């Protein structure tokens, strides 16, 4: 297990999930609004909006919140958000990619740069670390849909590239360009996915010790606390021993 998936598991074990739920809803709502503005406000005619709503439902976001976010896109006074990607380095030379939706690029860039600097990292130029990641589609299912063999069979039939299963669920990877087609094909055998999204997956992971892992966790935590930041990806890896200590 590596990178951001380890961070999520640590936060889950520490019980931090509930504390960030309201912030998560606002981030999901922002993605829904941007998706609705980018195309039609009808999820059956707008693939990005359909996936945004699906991901929001998977996080138990109330229907009223989802409807409000869609309606906000039609408002004349609605904010216009830009999609921005930041790339930089964390402690131990680890690579970090930050995706944001912002109505003020200067504010967000300043905040992200400050967070990197305070954590002993450095914000780089666009492209400075993304070459060491693959931009792929990731479709997740709960363990209850079936065992690893069943999911693997369905994934191969749907045209996916890989499947990983752990105690949290099934993670199906496919080409970014095929995300919509693969997720649709999977629904016939496995039902609706829990989440369907594009992610940055590290080609190689950088092992870090406990001290650097703690610094990285603080850095990622601070980035995710920023209202404009939607997703954070990294290529760090810690041993099971360090993971157990950090999760305590």
From Swiss-Prot:
Keyword DNA-binding: yes
InterPro entries linked: Integrase-like_N (IPR017856), TACO1_YebC-like_2nd/3rd_dom (IPR048300), TACO1_YebC_N (IPR049083), Transcrip_reg_TACO1-like (IPR002876), Transcrip_reg_TACO1-like_dom3 (IPR026564), YebC-like (IPR029072)
Pfam families: TACO1_YebC_N, Transcrip_reg
Molecular function as annotated in GO: DNA binding
Locations listed in the record: Cytoplasm
Keywords for the protein's UniProt record, in alphabetical order: Cytoplasm, DNA-binding, Transcription, Transcription regulation
Superkingdom classification of source: Bacteria
GO cellular component, one term: cytosol
Any GO BP annotation: regulation of DNA-templated transcription
Statement: the UniProt record of this protein carries the keyword Cell membrane: no
Family named by the database record: Belongs to the TACO1 family.
PANTHER family in the record: TRANSCRIPTIONAL REGULATORY PROTEIN YEBC-RELATED, TRANSLATIONAL ACTIVATOR OF CYTOCHROME C OXIDASE 1
UniProt name for this protein: Probable transcriptional regulatory protein RHECIAT_CH0003714
């Amino acid at each position: 297990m590596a990178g951001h998936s380890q961070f999520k598991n640590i936060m889950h074990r520490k019980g931090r999930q509930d504390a960030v739920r309201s912030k998560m809803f606002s981030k999901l709502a922002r993605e829904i609004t941007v998706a609705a503005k980018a195309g039609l406000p009808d999820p059956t005619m707008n693939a990005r909006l359909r996936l945004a709503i699906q991901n929001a439902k998977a996080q138990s976001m109330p229907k009223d919140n989802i409807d409000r976010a869609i309606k906000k896109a039609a408002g004349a006074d609605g904010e216009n958000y830009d999609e921005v990607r930041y790339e930089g380095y964390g402690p131990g030379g680890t690579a970090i990619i930050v995706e944001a939706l912002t109505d003020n690029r200067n504010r967000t860039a300043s905040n992200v740069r400050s967070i990197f600097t305070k954590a002993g990292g450095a914000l780089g130029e666009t492209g400075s670390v993304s070459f060491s990641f693959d931009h792929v589609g990731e479709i997740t299912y709960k363990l209850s849909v079936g065992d690893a063999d069943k999911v693997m069979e369905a994934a191969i039939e749907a045209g996916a590239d890989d499947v990983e299963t752990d105690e949290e669920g099934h993670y199906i990877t496919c080409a970014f360009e095929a995300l919509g087609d693969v997720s649709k094909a999977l629904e016939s055998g496995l039902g609706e996915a829990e989440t369907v999204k594009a992610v940055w997956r590290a080609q190689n992971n950088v092992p870090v010790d406990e001290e650097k892992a703690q610094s990285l966790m603080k850095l990622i935590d601070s980035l995710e606390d920023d209202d404009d930041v939607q997703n954070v990806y990294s290529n760090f890896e810690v041993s099971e021993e360090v993971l157990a200590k950090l999760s305590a």
